[in-house]
């Protein structure tokens, strides 16, 4: 029902994350199974994983299933990729070394893109070797479906992918500028994606829309607390129970040596954020009271009436982003609460922004 309403409301795409046990929010661990159902319940809505955790997948299986989904949907597949974390790799019986994890991600991505865009696959690498392997299934979209990368604008732009940022509005304008500058530097000024699209960049927004600010905040607050708990506590408890010291402390936040450091970008283009703008963004329409904007795991939640959400949307549009990612169901929000929020957003807010950032939905 939610998926069908997203389509009828005019959303561009639906993005589905990949999470696995012991995470509590691992209720759709097989994205392709779920998205196959989506392909049959919709006719226009685009969809895709955001992201496939590539080190956990065999590239041939991904090539085949991506091709199946693109054909089942009539060419509506979008592909998000990422390396995930070494904790997930460990629980899946893989190496817990971050450099090995990164190398596996890079090679899997190379094989997948090669296989999707050629009739025959040839590859010789550290983890996989294929010689003159026929690619019997090919995606409808050439050379392959649109590509997305999450969290790191540097990696997205350098590799010619659309970008989705996880965080809050503070500093997002700097991320947008960084992405556009790097795209121009590495892809070329005015260069489109491999599919001929304008590169998109958006921010995940956890939304609750209600008739009044007070009602929205009342709904959002307990749901947000549950969401923050679900994100990290079960995995942390499992790590502590097993005595996995390599995943504790600073080591849990290490990045591969050859990867752009997304933490450094917090200070990039800081001149764009004047004191006045920062203060205004810290309290747009009183939204900081809605379960704590930006609190917990780098995420933020926006809760309010349609008029309050419109105020937030004005600031979002002003960042220069051209994609808006809305998450309507998270934490302990019920289906009824989610549908009401989605309905208000679709009828009271979206009509004002149909020529602004393209709307997408993420779960």
Protein language model features and the residues they cover:
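Structural preference for beta-strand elements that scaffold enzyme active sites
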Residues: 13, 44-51, 76-80, 146-148, ...
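Glycine-rich, proline-tolerant flexible connector loops at the mouths of alpha/beta enzymes
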Residues: 13-34, 38, 53, 85, ...
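Conserved, mostly hydrophobic/aromatic
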Residues: 6, 18, 38, 69, ...
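Active-site mouth loops of central-metabolism enzymes
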Residues: 52-60, 141-151, 207-210, 295-307
């Amino acid at each position: 029902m939610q998926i069908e309403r997203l389509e009828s409301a005019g959303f561009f795409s639906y993005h589905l994350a990949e999470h696995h046990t012991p995470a509590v929010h691992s209720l759709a661990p097989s994205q392709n199974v779920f998205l196959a159902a989506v392909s049959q319940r919709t006719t226009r809505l685009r969809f895709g994983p955001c992201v496939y955790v590539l080190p956990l997948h065999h590239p041939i299986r991904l090539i085949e299933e991506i091709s199946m989904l693109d054909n089942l949907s009539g060419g509506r597949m979008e592909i998000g990729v990422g390396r995930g974390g070494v904790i997930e790799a460990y629980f899946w019986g893989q190496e817990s070394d971050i450099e090995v994890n990164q190398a596996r991600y890079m090679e899997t991505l190379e094989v997948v893109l090669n296989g999707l865009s050629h009739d025959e696959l040839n590859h010789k690498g550290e983890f996989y070797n294929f010689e003159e392997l026929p690619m019997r299934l090919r995606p409808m979209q050439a050379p392959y479906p649109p590509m997305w990368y999450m969290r790191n604008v540097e990696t997205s732009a350098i590799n010619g992918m659309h970008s989705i940022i996880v965080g809050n509005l503070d500093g997002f304008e700097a991320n947008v500028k960084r992405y556009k500058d790097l795209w121009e530097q590495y892809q070329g000024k005015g260069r489109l994606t491999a599919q001929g699209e304008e590169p998109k960049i958006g921010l995940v927004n956890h939304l609750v829309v209600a008739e009044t600010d007070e009602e929205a905040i009342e709904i959002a607050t307990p749901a947000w607390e549950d969401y923050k708990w679900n994100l990290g506590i079960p995995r942390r408890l499992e790590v502590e129970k097993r005595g996995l010291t390599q995943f504790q402390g600073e080591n849990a936040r290490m990045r591969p040596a050859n990867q752009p450091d997304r933490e450094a970008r917090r200070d990039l283009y800081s001149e764009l954020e004047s004191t006045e703008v920062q203060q205004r963004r810290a309290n747009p329409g009183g939204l900081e009271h809605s379960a704590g904007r930006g609190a917990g795991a780098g995420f933020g939640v926006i809760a309010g009436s349609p008029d309050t959400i419109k105020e937030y949307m004005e600031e979002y549009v002003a960042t220069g982003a051209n994609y808006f990612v809305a998450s309507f169901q998270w934490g302990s929000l019920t289906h009824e609460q989610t549908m009401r929020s989605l309905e208000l957003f679709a009828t009271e807010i979206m009509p004002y922004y149909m020529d602004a950032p393209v709307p997408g939905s993420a779960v």
